[in-house]
């Protein structure tokens, strides 16, 4: 078959406190995170937002040791995957490509070309597809493939989502069962699935299949678990007053507390590695909300990380992908006919003198409004939570 490679995609995270500001800048520079009518405004606005949010984010990272463990865990997953693939008879080089921090996806691609990889499996470490996670990485890779001639000879295939993979479901069920056994009455514990949220408009206007895949994944895990426990699905990490997928995790915890739930185990359903949203948001912030709501026995299921059943599931995904017809980045970026990846081309105005004059006037008004908001502490960006 030739030299085989596997590219693991993930979000990335700051390794130390000094990295938080640059990481946030990279995050908000992504048009899939903040969409603006003028592309050249993206980076200045990203710099302003990152500058305002850095201190608060650093405090959160201090609570989990001063940095994100995501890179370390992802690299460990890669090493375990390489070993398991070898055990199953498939030798492969493993590469890690992060979207917003080192090692960047571009760095991984450079190494892939240097290593003369002939067959590549692109595997996002997001079980469920969303335009803001896997979709953003796929758009970047598609752009790199179009611009870099050295990538053209590589036969590649994409795994867009894999939440139905039996091994993944089994790993999640085993982790939940182990945590349930820590309670005096395991069958009476309420199972609380918490997924990373996205704005509701992503689903209703852009056709993002994320909510459907999360709901299906929850049902499949409960079916695999085969326990009588009641369960709830909620969405965390909402920012600002814009409506996101509901119910919100914080509200759902309060409601369960009001209903008299005392024993609860949280399942981070959209995360396969420990990071800020599991270690700080769930373990610290939501634990406090739960306890204040009367839920006194609060536990969390660990992320799969390098769980052997989970790693074997990833290996099976890779082997199956190599056997089946290739799935291209252009297909992955448009998984459904209705999915709109918000191409920035729609905002490119003609470069006429008149257009440039109006563009300049609008930009000036925008910057003036931004400066006024930064000085006064009030305005649209504060309302939606991008400035604090």
From Swiss-Prot:
Cited PROSITE patterns: FERROCHELATASE
Annotated SUPFAM superfamilies: Chelatase, Chlorophyll a-b binding protein
Location of this chain's protein in the cell: Cytoplasm
GO molecular function terms noted in the UniProt entry: ferrochelatase activity; metal ion binding
Gene Ontology terms describing biological process: heme biosynthetic process
Record keyword Cell wall biogenesis/degradation present: no
UniProt pathway: Porphyrin-containing compound metabolism; protoheme biosynthesis; protoheme from protoporphyrin-IX: step 1/1
Chief location bin: cytoplasm
CDD domains xref list: Ferrochelatase_C, Ferrochelatase_N
InterPro entries the UniProt entry points to: Ferrochelatase, Ferrochelatase_AS, Ferrochelatase_C, Ferrochelatase_N
Residues reported to bind Fe cation: 196, 277
The entry's keywords: Cytoplasm, Heme biosynthesis, Iron, Lyase, Metal-binding, Porphyrin biosynthesis
Keyword flag Lyase: yes
EC number(s) given by UniProt: 4.98.1.1
Family: Belongs to the ferrochelatase family.
Cited PANTHER family: FERROCHELATASE, FERROCHELATASE, MITOCHONDRIAL
Primary role: Catalyzes the ferrous insertion into protoporphyrin IX.
Name the record gives this protein: Ferrochelatase
Organism: Nostoc punctiforme (strain ATCC 29133 / PCC 73102)
Lineage: Bacteria, Bacillati, Cyanobacteriota, Cyanophyceae, Nostocales
Gene from which this protein is expressed: hemH
